[in-house]
Amino acid sequence: MIQIVIDGTAQLAHEDELVVDVIVRAGKTIPHVCYHKQLGPIQTCDTCMVEVNGRLVRACATRVAAGMQVSTDSAKASAAQTEAFDQILSNHLLYCTVCDNNNGNCTVHNTTKMLAIEHQRIPFKPKPYEVDETNPFYRYDPSQCILCGRCVEACQNVEVNETLSINWEDPNPRVLWDGGSTIGESSCVSCGHCVTVCPCNALMEKTMLGQAGFLTNLRKSTLSSMIDVVKGVEPETGYGGILQVSEIEHSMREHRIRKTKTVCTYCGVGCSFDVWTKDRHILKIAPEHGPANGISTCIKGKFGWGHINSSDRLTSPLIRENGEFRKATWDEALALIARRLSEIKSQTGPDSLAFIASSKCTNEESFLMQKLARSVIGTNNIDNCSRYCQSPATVGLFRTVGYGGDSGSISDIEQADLVMIIGSNTAESHPVIATRVKSSHKLNGQKLIVSDIREHEMARRADIFLHPKPSTDLVWLNAISRYLLDNELANKKFLNEWVNGLDEFRKSLGPFTMEAAASITGLSVETLTTVAQMIAQAKRMCILWAMGITQHSQGSDSSTAISNLLLVTGNYRRPGTGAYPLRGHNNVQGASDHGAMPNDLAGYQSVDDPEVRARHEAAWKVSLPTTKGLDNHQMVEAIHAGKLKSMYIIGEEMSIVDSNANDVESAFEKLDFFVVQDIFFSHTCRYADVVLPGAPSLEKEGTFTSTERRVQRLYQVLEPLGCCRPDWAIIRDVANELGANWDYQHPSQVMDEIASLTPMFAGVNYQRLEGYKSLQWPVAADGSDEPLLYTKNFAFSDGKARLYPVSWIGPVDQPDAEYDLHLNNGRLLEHFHEGNLTYRTEGIRQKTPNVFVEVSPELAEDRGIQSGTWVQLISRYGQVRVRAVVTDRVSGNELYMPMNSPDIAVNRLTGSHIDPVTNTPAYKESSVRLKVLEGGENPLPRMNWRFGHPTPQQGVEVERKWKRSDYRMPGDGLVQIQLAPRQE
């Protein structure tokens, strides 16, 4: 720490700290319109002028130095601040009382008040541009835009979508999308970063317009008249009185606008933010404090909330009678469930029943679901959808390092010298994590290697893009491990001190020469050698992977090979290193963590451990089953075999997300009794005998656990719709109807029980998770957590990691003469899985209304296919009819079909092949043939972002503004400072 002096008072500061941050931390008020702590210095507004050692400088662009004398309110500084703000007001019409942004957080309004601006010295001049309304979620008003550049900085350097810029050389500058396109036809992915950081009302969510204020829902003509009245009064009264009126109106808003913290319900990143509501109307999503995401969101988290108030929400229980569903009371539904489950248990035993927890539900709900199965019914037949995607990654980590989760945090990924992404379309599946990689790669020199069979965004940004043959990643991973060991490039010190099994591991690598790997994978020896050298040279490496690794017949072994490589190179235990299996759902990590698994109770405590069972039996006052239960895959087999008679599924579209969907549906038809609990009448509900209406995330409390093991609280934003109940309450009521005596009144009581039974969560409670606080497991009883794992030792009895030998077998379903094409599948940015939630947001439906199959240009030319052509895909297990999109994202005989349709489901084509270690389906090993049908329209509308043309640049490029002939530096002797990069 160093000492500086601010307005005569000594203040401690970090050596590389910006003056503006020290001033704010000291409790001083200083205008700073363009500066945002999560964006860094932009230097466009000039309002943060201060005197440093007698010279005017921008506080946002000056780093502290020992002994520095800073004056924030000298005559020179104050005059410069006011002069700069006058320039801003010439670009912005103040009509705060009738503005939807008059909510206490408008930087322009607050700065006008701070500087006690009474009169506008430079007249406002509207810009000669129309308001751009072409994006379904937000609008841009150029005449209200102050050209601060925050939105550009956020788009170029935080989100790194590189869509926004400012045409500084134009006589009337404005923010541009793709250099001049409409927003709707640009490359904008609707992440919302720009709207979030806008300091005024130039960029606003459409859900706010006409809704936030008492006087904002006016006809345009009436609004214009009121603005004219305000402007007419201003010369005589000044802004003081006008602002007082607007602040009264703002204070009135405070009584009807609620701001409630929640955690995103979509992917596993764990974004958290405030939800602004007026009654049941969702005004906006406001990210600011999230420990995982900061200001960042994606289209789904920022705008994808149409499902909450959708007209087709389930609002009462349904019972099937005579082949039709009728509405029922809760008493009816619960009584029927209890009677039928009890009868089946009595007739065919507890193991003839099975339960599926939801990765969309909370930790507490997953815990109660497995408790219902085990302590009330008496079966370990409980699973969740991690079986479909993440179980192989968990196995790979359990084998090698001992914990089945990310070894560090998102911040570690940012710090890495080298990031490898294998089998993950990160920019679309985990977009906020992708922003951190893209930003570090663009701004900080981070190296990026991507391995995938599809050239998605991260592949195109990579320093090296590996395109191996399908299902061969294990081969080149093992080959690189061997190369590093053979060439003395492994981390010997780390291996000697922290790793067991090196000799046997070396022997297992015998077949994996670079030449053999090249032959199998199709990658060249030169490319593989270059990759190995980059890995050896990197001081800190992280590896990210997802379903492109796990959803193979050797998903567990390939995940193991990744962790082996990290051990060989010593890339555990240190910041900026580690293994990151990116979890798919918002709480797929938490569902597994909290016992919704056939072999483990909460905290991965084995069901066959007598000590573990005894502890739970004492607490629950029951005897527990002693043997491992059935997983998802085995449940379907057991139904067909006549052994499984009943299922209870919560929030899982199992009929179409499981592989070989036709086989799963035929199994469901054989069940004697089937309960489905969901928020919509899903495809799976069609097979149910009873449907129970659960509550989405905004209508309940609880916790989610993100991909980085981060446990976070979500708070109830809205009351449950109709007769819906929170899922934890439904499970409690079912258990009690079956004779249990559960007395939970709030999810916090469930978490307290979890902590009492589970060493991994011993210190987790709701007080420690208040607001935006979070904990990353394992959490000791005193509340201390571990953002970075293995700093003391690895999670084995001897404290050492284990190299685990794996061999390569090859894919199970390979193309042949009859089924000559390889079908890949996965997510889209704008939809989540089959779209049960996202299709209910109209703007997302407009942007991406249809499913499609991607076809390579060469295959399209060979088969006579154009974008829009209807094709029939036929596999050994089923067929679908779908329209084609011709794109170079795929090549050769590769096809890619996203999963965003319950009606044209890709899992009609996938088979029942599995990873034998986990029973995870080999979704990515599917062969099909293609039949060309008739022509049609492109399934992607012109307003889809994939047709845009980004305009990459280094931030806002403020130097171009400074070169304008009409630019005047406020004050005398302003020092133009090129901000030095922060020293590591």
What is each of the regions a protein language model found here?
Residues 5, 66-72, 177-180, 460-468, ...:
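Short beta-alpha connecting loops at secondary-structure transitions
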Residues 11-66:
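N-terminal cofactor/phosphate-binding cores enriched in small/glycine residues
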Residues 101-102, 172, 210-218, 358-359, ...:
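A glycine-rich phosphate-binding loop feature that marks nucleotide/adenosyl-phosphate handling sites
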Residues 53, 65, 276-281, 876:
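Short acidic-glycine loop/turn motifs at beta-strand connectors
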Residues 46-47, 52-262:
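Fe-S ferredoxin-like electron-transfer domains
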Residues 582, 589-598, 615, 747-843:
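Long, low-complexity segments enriched in small/aliphatic residues
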Residues 721-723, 727-775, 834, 839-854, ...:
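Long, contiguous, secondary-structure-rich segments that constitute the structural scaffold
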Residues 93, 196, 225-700, 734, ...:
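Catalytic alpha/large subunits of respiratory electron-transfer oxidoreductases
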